[in-house]
C-alpha cells in the first residue's frame, strides 16, 4: 500500500472523528479569525495524527462535551495538515508554545488556558475528559 494513501486515510478518519462529535473544522486563516473572535467561550481542539490524539485527545473531546457546562463554540484545526489555519489559531494562544494535540479555551477571542500535549500524553481519555470538564465548570455556562 502506498504510504501517502495510507496516511490520507488516517487523516480522513481523524477529521471525521472530531467533526462527527460536533466540532467545526477551520481550514483557513479567515475561518479561524471568524470563529475565534465570536462572543462567548470557544474550545479549540488542535488535532493531529499521533497516537495520543486518536487514543486520548479525540475521545476526550467527544466525551467532555456531554456535561452540564460546556463551551458555546467547538472548533478544530489540524496540525500538520491545515498549516495556515493552525498557525493562525496559535497566534491566539498567547503564552503557550505550539503543541499538538492540545485544547485551547478562549473567551471572547482571548486565551483563558490550554491543555497541552504533556497534559494529554500518558493520561487516559477519561482523565483528559475530567481536565476539560473542570475547565468548563470554571469558565463556561450551563447549557
UniProtKB/Swiss-Prot annotation:
InterPro entries on file: BrxB/BrxA
Q: Which N-terminal residues, if any, form the signal peptide?
A: none
| GO annotation terms (biological process) | cell redox homeostasis
Give the family from UniProt. Answer: Belongs to the bacilliredoxin family.
For this entry, the protein name equals: Bacilliredoxin OB1863
Amino acid at each position: 500500500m502506498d504510504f501517502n494513501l495510507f496516511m490520507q486515510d488516517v487523516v480522513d478518519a481523524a477529521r471525521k472523528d472530531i467533526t462527527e462529535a460536533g466540532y467545526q473544522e477551520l481550514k483557513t486563516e479567515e475561518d479561524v479569525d471568524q470563529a475565534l473572535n465570536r462572543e462567548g467561550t470557544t474550545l479549540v481542539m488542535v488535532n493531529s495524527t499521533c497516537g495520543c490524539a486518536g487514543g486520548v485527545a479525540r475521545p476526550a473531546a467527544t466525551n467532555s462535551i456531554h456535561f452540564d457546562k460546556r463551551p458555546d463554540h467547538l472548533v478544530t484545526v489540524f496540525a500538520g495538515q491545515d498549516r495556515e489555519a493552525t498557525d493562525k489559531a496559535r497566534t491566539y494562544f498567547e503564552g503557550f508554545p505550539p503543541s499538538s494535540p492540545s485544547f485551547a479555551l478562549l473567551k471572547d477571542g482571548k486565551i483563558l488556558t490550554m491543555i497541552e500535549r504533556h497534559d494529554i500524553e500518558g493520561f487516559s481519555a477519561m482523565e483528559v475528559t475530567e481536565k476539560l470538564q473542570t475547565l468548563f465548570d470554571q469558565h463556561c455556562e450551563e447549557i
